[in-house]
Amino acid sequence: SPVNTQARAMPAALYFDYLGVRLDGIRAQGKSLDLLIRLTDTQEGWELHLANSVLTAHRADRDRRAPLLTCTRLQMMALFEGRLTPEQAVQQGLLQNAAPVKELLSLLDSFRPDFQLVLP
């Protein structure tokens, strides 16, 4: 898939909001998920939480649990945008377990950032 240049300019908090917009609420019904992410380039910790068909993110800098995903912000974006598969991320030592990320990816809609606008 093409590189989403708009997303590359987003700080992590805004990018996680973007993922929340991509979440298909109907497919996410009844699903619950927690992903702890450590961004090595910005030294930020984040927890993604899926519940009630809503994906939220909050800072988790002091969380002592082992992160599921440890990578740079751009590597994380590549994973969530399909340019890096969960299996590749596991092989590269970035991702501890592919299953939770695969589940989240299955709940996200894909859309082109250059969609046409329909005007009245």
PLM features: residue spans?
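Acidic, aliphatic-rich amphipathic alpha-helical segments
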Residues: S1-T56, A98-P120
